């Protein structure tokens, strides 16, 4: 190890998912040496099973990527996590519902009577209930199953599920790459209130001090 390497501040940055287009800037900065120029030795890691936010809050990672809606639930609890959002990754919320083309789920009400893969997050489910019922559908008639999916287009093609919440920049583009015909609607197009910043970069509160 050179003396210059020893002078670099070691940073662990935890992703929210497998590496994808939402993380492009992190890897570009690494490849172009921007971290080193800033005096940083950044290790980018994938999240543990219990998530990036917990890893960041525990101090195992100084920074992480997290969805703002998930983060809100982590802060609004009896034991809020010691994390703070410090930057937005995208200017607009590009998340929405991906489904098989022609299944009628190109609008929220089309999810009525269909199967949706859920993380069982309170804000996730409240968002879906709002957009589905507001569009004339019935959220109570949506069949909820656990979301253990890593390849969304493949899962739809195999009829493992009917609808999945994805970021278009990854799930939607991935469907095009895999040539899987899909329908998609953005939450921000259904109601502008859902055009919040997500994902965001979060930091460990003790590290920030």
Identify the residue ranges that each predicted region occupies:
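Extended ligand-binding regions for polar small-molecule ligands
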Residues: 32-36, 197-209
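Short, glycine-/small- and polar/acidic-enriched structural segments
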Residues: 5-148, 153-158, 162-169, 184-189, ...
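N-terminal low-complexity, intrinsically disordered segments
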Residues: 180-182
């Amino acid at each position: 190890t050179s003396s210059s390497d020893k002078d670099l501040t070691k940073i662990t940055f935890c992703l929210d998912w497998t590496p994808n287009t939402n993380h492009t800037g992190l890897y570009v900065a690494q490849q172009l040496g921007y971290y080193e120029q800033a005096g940083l030795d950044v290790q980018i890691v994938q999240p543990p099973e219990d998530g990036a936010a917990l890893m960041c809050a525990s101090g195992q990672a100084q920074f992480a990527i997290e969805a703002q809606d998930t983060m809100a639930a982590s802060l609004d609890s009896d034991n809020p996590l010691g994390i703070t959002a410090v930057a937005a990754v995208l200017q607009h919320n590009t998340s929405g519902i991906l489904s098989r083309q022609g299944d009628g789920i190109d609008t929220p009400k089309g999810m009525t009577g269909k199967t949706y893969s859920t993380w069982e997050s309170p804000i996730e489910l409240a968002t879906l209930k709002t957009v589905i019922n507001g569009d004339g559908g019935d959220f109570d008639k949506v069949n909820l199953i656990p979301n253990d999916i890593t390849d969304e287009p493949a899962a739809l093609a195999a009829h493992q599920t009917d609808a999945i919440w994805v970021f278009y920049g990854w799930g939607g583009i991935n469907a095009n790459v895999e040539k899987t015909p899909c329908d998609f609607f953005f939450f921000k197009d259904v109601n502008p209130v859902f055009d919040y910043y997500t994902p965001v970069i979060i930091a460990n509160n003790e590290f920030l001090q």
